[in-house]
Amino acid sequence: MLKYVVTDIGKMCLYIWPYRVWSWRRLFIFRVLNVVSIAILFETPHRLALVLNVCLYTHISMCLYNCYCLYNVVTFSLNLILISMTFI
């Protein structure tokens, strides 16, 4: 079960971004932050909330100027709620 959740989180964290408006530096920082957060999840699975918060914070902090990204943040938040409910 955890393997599938990690895969889903990885997909959401690493592949949801507007390619056309972000510079390569922002994409690099975004990818590094989320790879680190997924690594934390592998190390301590009970810290799932921390990982999801890191991913969500990255989305919000790097996307506030773009309406398309706001849509991604909303859909990402809904996915986080659904994922966290699987652990309750």
From Swiss-Prot:
Keywords: Membrane, Transmembrane, Transmembrane helix
Membrane topology value: Multi-pass membrane protein
Keyword hit for Membrane: yes
Gene Ontology CC annotations of this record: membrane
Name the UniProt record assigns to this protein: Putative uncharacterized protein YCR097W-A
Compartments, record wording: Membrane
Keyword Transmembrane: yes
Source organism phylogeny: Eukaryota, Fungi, Dikarya, Ascomycota, Saccharomycotina
Transmembrane annotation, as ranges: 27-46, 61-83
